[in-house]
Amino acid sequence: MTAVCTCELARRSDVEAISNMSRWLIEAGLTPMWVPERVLWHMRDRESTVLVARDQTRLVGFAIMQFMDSSAHLNLLGVMPSRQRSGIGRQLLRWLETSAVTAGTFLVKLEVRESNHAARRFYASVGYTETGVVEGYYQGRDNAVRMSRNLSVLKASGG
C-alpha cells in the first residue's frame, strides 16, 4: 500500500500532537521525555528537523532528527498504527536522509527498543545495521539496539 500523505516541516500547532504520539507510540510504559517543550525546542533548533506526515489535515506520522558535526541522530520516528506499513515511515526517513546528505552528513544513528522487533525489521529493510546494545537505555527498564546507516551510497547514486 502506498502512502497518500504530505510530508512537511512541523508547525507550532503540531507540537502537542507530536508529543502525544511519542508518548503512545514510542514511550509507552516510560516516563514521557518528549514533552511539548522539548519538541518545540527541536523545532526552534537550527541543528534539528521536525517533520510531520499529514493525511489531508490529520497528523499520521512524525520524525525528529538532530544534525551534529559528523553524523545525524534520528531521535524519533512514529506512524499511527492504522497507517503503519503504508510507506509513511519510509517517506519521512527518506526526507531526513536526503537533508543529511545535502548538508554533507553521511552517517545516521538511532536507538530502538530491543523488544521492538517490527521497528528493527523496518530499519534493517531501509539499510540500517545493528551496531550494539545499550543495557537499560530506556530509563533503566529496556535495552536499546543501536543502529546506523552510511548514506554515502545515496550521494553516489544521486538520491
Task: Specify the residue positions occupied by each region the protein language model found.
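Conserved catalytic core of the tyrosine transesterase superfamily
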Residues: L107, R113, M147-N150, K155
